[in-house]
Amino acid sequence: MEEEEFLSRCIRCFQCGEVCENGCIQFNGIDRGLDVAFTPYIHPRTQGCTTCMKCTEVCPTGALQPVAPKEVKMGVARLNEDMCYSFAEPAPRTCGVCYRACPFPGHAMTIGLYDQPQVHPDACVGCGLCEQACVHLPQAIRIIPV
């Protein structure tokens, strides 16, 4: 669903945030503008989404619609190899934390030598669990919204 349609359907009822057991759903403030005020969003570094889909079950207007977890598309992970410990030169260190956090390992992300992660953009749902788990600061992997 396009953002414009989502914004027209969302009635700012906060039910999605109340039902979210992971606590990943936050709400925009007025400072973001009246058109998006009080609408839900996810800040992956703070708390990634487990794609439980409970938010879609309680949405009274269909602004959030149920889809299979692997079909969710909130964004895509982008890896900065220059910052990733597994790619560090001259001596890479085994890390793989992002891979182990991924809910779709082997599909959305694979790993190679030294646990070097490889993101598969077509399969990445943008849940942010990899970004949340990244031990490098600033994080070597980030979610880019779509």
Kindly give the residue locations of the regions a language model identified.
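C-terminal segment of N-terminal export signals and the immediately downstream linker at the start
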Residues: 1-19, 30-36
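Flexible gly/pro/ser-rich segments immediately N-terminal to CXXCH heme-c attachment motifs
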Residues: 2-10, 39-50, 84, 116-126
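Gly/Gly-Pro-rich "capping" loops immediately C-terminal to redox-active cysteine motifs
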Residues: 31-45, 75-77
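Histidine/lysine/aspartate-rich catalytic loop segments that bind and position anionic ligands
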Residues: 65-83, 87
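Intrinsically disordered, low-complexity Ser/Thr- and acidic-rich flexible linkers and loops
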Residues: 89-93
